[in-house]
Amino acid sequence: MAIEKKFVNDGYVKASMDEYFAEQLSRAGYGGMELNRTPMGTQIVIYSEKPGMVIGKAGKVIRKLTRDVANKYSLENPQIDAQEVKRPELNAQMMASRLAASIERGWYFRKAGHNTLRAVMNAGALGCEVVISGKLTGARSRVEKFVDGYIKHSGNPVEEVVDEGFAVAVKKLGTLGCKVRIIQPGVVLPDSYKVRESVEVEEPAEKPAEKPAEKPAEKAAAPKKEAAKARAPAPAPEAPAPAPEAPAPAPVEEAEVAEPEEAEEVQAETSEEIEGAELVYVEGSDEVRRQVNGVWQHKHGSYDYWHPMARVHKEAKE
């Protein structure tokens, strides 16, 4: 047998066997079958709402099905297993059979279609499509569709993720075809995607720089430095220039001159700060200058100790 004919024959056997089981097990709630060929024989799994009716009393029904399948389809050592469907609302074949039974009992087709669609979606399906075709309300045949959720109609995903069931409802005006297509919950569709939420990355807070520990000598010099600034006299204001007509020059206010003891104390207090100060020597004189805490100081001649340059010296008496 050519390979093409073998595939056609296998498909015919499977479709014919499915119709046979649907006819024989309609009262048991037939929900589809699986056919697996193995070296040990042919394994057939029947899904049913009532597996007890598939097996029958003392296995009578299942033995009859096994004999009929072996003789009708020439299968070697067929083994039939019955399994229960826990959620019939997600089985397309069962829902199609229920829809056909509802229409045969006299339900209006639109009410039956909406009830079937609602039951499937409430069970958690991603999508469902119910199609009823035939003489619905008049002499002409027409098609009514009820769709909810997401349904694939073409491509390879139709064979992989879409469960399809079909049943026939026989009425006085004629037969009605009932088709139900379901996409099971949890199925990952090929065109599905997820949008990642932007995550804000928090920058670590900068720790304040730790100040180096002060040396004991610097700590002790700080209060002395403040005391020296407080005791230093403010510079005297400049005297106005004498008028040219006045014979005698205007008297100049004498600034307080630090006593030798005070000068020695200031010199002792500030000697520790001279290390970082830069000395400036004035050319042509014995004056030496430096800047301490933003104040220019100098020493020269008879005033051989550091004192502010803004201080007015007492004039030497003739």
From Swiss-Prot:
Residues 17-86 form the KH type-2 domain. Keywords: Ribonucleoprotein, Ribosomal protein, RNA-binding, rRNA-binding. PROSITE patterns: KH_TYPE_2. It comes from the Archaea. Residues 198-275 are annotated as: Disordered. One of its GO terms (molecular function) is structural constituent of ribosome. GO terms for biological process: translation. InterPro entries: KH_dom (IPR004087), KH_dom-like_a/b (IPR015946), KH_dom_type_2 (IPR004044), KH_sf_prok-type (IPR009019), Ribosomal_S3_C_sf (IPR036419), Ribosomal_uS3_arc (IPR027488), Ribosomal_uS3_C (IPR001351), Ribosomal_uS3_euk/arc (IPR005703). Residues 234-250 have a biased composition (Pro residues). One of its GO terms (cellular component) is cytosolic small ribosomal subunit. Gene3D superfamilies: 3.30.300.20, Ribosomal protein S3, C-terminal domain. PANTHER family: 30S/40S RIBOSOMAL PROTEIN S3, SMALL RIBOSOMAL SUBUNIT PROTEIN US3. Binds the lower part of the 30S subunit head. Belongs to the universal ribosomal protein uS3 family. This is Small ribosomal subunit protein uS3.
